[in-house]
Amino acid sequence: MATASRFLLRKLPRFLKLSPTLLRSNGVRVSSNLIQDSIEPLDSFWRIGSRIRHDSLTTRSFSSQGPASVDYSSVLQEEEFHKLANFTINHLLEKIEDYGDNVQIDGFDIDYGNEVLTLKLGSLGTYVLNKQTPNRQIWMSSPVSGPSRFDWDRDANAWIYRRTEAKLHKLLEEELENLCGEPIQLS
């Protein structure tokens, strides 16, 4: 058995707080002396070297780690989300179709199917917009700004990307004008 594997077997029971009986019942054979020999040096390390006990590390609550989960259904009811998202996507479809008549872009094509809006701008790239019902968001993939997730903001009456505070319509207007050379009014 490799040295690293033996080291892990000696240290693992202490970190997992497993008794030798429990380990044997799971098919792992470890002698009590081996466990005791590995525990004593670790106890000294945790008490003296770091002033932190091992049990404080293994019983730490992970609820404080990372962002809190959001119950999106409480933010926007599903029926209201679909109504707002469908209206927005259909509105964008109509406006961008009209815009396509005014710009000379090889490969310009807009398609809406399976609740996904796809705008192809030939060699300039492709936009994809779709609903994410569980999150109550509209997701956009842009050849300019990359992926964005827009939440409905009741106060602003707009879809907002929380990371940058960008509004969906405004962001699309700016990017399409820069890419295609013609202004567009989406709002």
Curated annotation (Swiss-Prot):
<keyword id="KW-0813">Transport</keyword>
<keyword id="KW-0560">Oxidoreductase</keyword>
<dbReference type="InterPro" id="IPR020895">
    <property type="entry name" value="Frataxin_CS"/>
</dbReference>
<keyword id="KW-0409">Iron storage</keyword>
<dbReference type="GO" id="GO:0016226">
    <property type="term" value="P:iron-sulfur cluster assembly"/>
</dbReference>
<dbReference type="InterPro" id="IPR002908">
    <property type="entry name" value="Frataxin/CyaY"/>
</dbReference>
<keyword id="KW-0408">Iron</keyword>
<keyword id="KW-0410">Iron transport</keyword>
<dbReference type="InterPro" id="IPR017789">
    <property type="entry name" value="Frataxin"/>
</dbReference>
<dbReference type="GO" id="GO:0006783">
    <property type="term" value="P:heme biosynthetic process"/>
</dbReference>
<dbReference type="Pfam" id="PF01491">
    <property type="entry name" value="Frataxin_Cyay"/>
</dbReference>
<dbReference type="GO" id="GO:0009507">
    <property type="term" value="C:chloroplast"/>
</dbReference>
<keyword id="KW-0350">Heme biosynthesis</keyword>
<keyword id="KW-0406">Ion transport</keyword>
<dbReference type="GO" id="GO:0006879">
    <property type="term" value="P:intracellular iron ion homeostasis"/>
</dbReference>
<dbReference type="GO" id="GO:0009793">
    <property type="term" value="P:embryo development ending in seed dormancy"/>
</dbReference>
<comment type="subunit">
    <text>Monomer. Oligomer. Interacts with NIFS1.</text>
</comment>
<dbReference type="GO" id="GO:0006979">
    <property type="term" value="P:response to oxidative stress"/>
</dbReference>
<dbReference type="GO" id="GO:0005739">
    <property type="term" value="C:mitochondrion"/>
</dbReference>
<dbReference type="GO" id="GO:1903329">
    <property type="term" value="P:regulation of iron-sulfur cluster assembly"/>
</dbReference>
<dbReference type="GO" id="GO:0008199">
    <property type="term" value="F:ferric iron binding"/>
</dbReference>
<dbReference type="GO" id="GO:0005829">
    <property type="term" value="C:cytosol"/>
</dbReference>
<comment type="similarity">
    <text>Belongs to the frataxin family.</text>
</comment>
<dbReference type="GO" id="GO:0004322">
    <property type="term" value="F:ferroxidase activity"/>
</dbReference>
<protein>
    <recommendedName>
        <fullName>Frataxin, mitochondrial</fullName>
        <ecNumber>1.16.3.1</ecNumber>
    </recommendedName>
</protein>
<dbReference type="GO" id="GO:0006826">
    <property type="term" value="P:iron ion transport"/>
</dbReference>
<keyword id="KW-0809">Transit peptide</keyword>
<dbReference type="InterPro" id="IPR036524">
    <property type="entry name" value="Frataxin/CyaY_sf"/>
</dbReference>
<dbReference type="GO" id="GO:0009060">
    <property type="term" value="P:aerobic respiration"/>
</dbReference>
<comment type="function">
    <text>Promotes the biosynthesis of heme as well as the assembly and repair of iron-sulfur clusters by delivering Fe(2+) to proteins involved in these pathways. May play a role in the protection against iron-catalyzed oxidative stress through its ability to catalyze the oxidation of Fe(2+) to Fe(3+). May be able to store large amounts of the metal in the form of a ferrihydrite mineral by oligomerization. Binds to the mitochondrial cysteine desulfurase NIFS1 and increases its activity.</text>
</comment>
<dbReference type="GO" id="GO:0042542">
    <property type="term" value="P:response to hydrogen peroxide"/>
</dbReference>
<keyword id="KW-0496">Mitochondrion</keyword>
